Amino acid sequence: MSQVSLSQQLKEGNLFAEQCPSREVLKHVTSRWGVLILVALREGTHRFSDLRRKIGGVSEKMLAQSLQALEQDGFLNRIAYPVVPPHVEYSLTPLGEQVSEKVAALADWIELNLPEVLAVRDERAA
């Protein structure tokens, strides 16, 4: 059995390898706010302030950081209009549409199965 070098693993991608770049992408996509941003943008283009209102509990700082990470990964388009006050819009790229479909399916599954999950949680806490 041959050993696969770290550089080969990084080239091919191996989520279980400590240094694999896919882990950083996974962190951005599956973060608390990343999932909600991707699901919210499935409805279409949103301004920063719209996203902040829509995603309850997110701070301005965390929303900005999460949007920036998703944009850097190629999942979001960001358009800043040169007006006062600032007007910035976010939308999904084709890659973002693909990943948002996956996380939306996970979010749907969670919502559908939440009563059972909560019942098991309560049962095990007792």
UniProtKB/Swiss-Prot annotation:
Domain called HTH hxlR-type: residue spans: 20-118
Keywords: DNA-binding, Transcription, Transcription regulation
Source organism: Escherichia coli (strain K12)
SUPFAM superfamilies per the UniProt record, alphabetical: Winged helix' DNA-binding domain
InterPro entries reported in the protein's UniProt record: HTH_HxlR, WH-like_DNA-bd_sf, WH_DNA-bd_sf
Protein name in the entry: Uncharacterized HTH-type transcriptional regulator YtfH
SS bond partners: none
Single GO biological process annotation from the record: regulation of DNA-templated transcription
Claim: DNA-binding is one of the keywords in the record: yes
Any one cellular-component term (Gene Ontology): protein-DNA complex
Keyword Mitochondrion in annotation: no
GO molecular function: DNA binding; DNA-binding transcription factor activity
